[in-house]
Amino acid sequence: MEHGYTALWRRFQKALKQRNQLLRHGRMDEDSLRAWTAELIPLSEQITDFRKQYLADLTKQVLAVAGRFDGLGVLELEYYQGWDDQLSLEEVLAGDRTRDIATGKTNHGAHKADIRINVDGVAAAERLSRGQVKLLVYALKLAQG
């Protein structure tokens, strides 16, 4: 799986780089922008699928490891895919077109993904002490093997 993900990520990075270069130009080639956008969308979706599966597996391990530490509370790992999950990436990028051109970059996609960690329903950064954050980091590292 790791090799497949790495190859996929490289293809995604190439498409993102090409799309962003087009967005930065004052006069852009619309056909090229459409082509790189069409390449970027399925790659983003495939990367998202890989990551969701990885996080689901990791979450099980993290919960098992974190359960050995006192005082961490109820952990929840949430995956943010880099765009509103109620919309397709195609819809989001179409809606972002003006903003993307103005900023010269692609504002949504797999490159904007994040993992949000909550403890007892509150962001871990707001809830945990520095010592508890260290325990959480240890749990994450141990869970990854």
Feature locations, PLM:
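Amphipathic alpha-helical coiled-coil segments with heptad-repeat character
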Residues: 5, 9, 26, 30-33
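Conserved NTPase motor "head" modules and their coupling/switch loops across ABC/AAA+ ATPases, GTPases
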Residues: 28-145
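Flexible interhelical turns and helix-capping residues at alpha-helix boundaries
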Residues: 2-5, 23-26, 47, 51
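Extended, charged alpha-helical "arm/stalk" segments used for dimerization and assembly
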Residues: 1-22
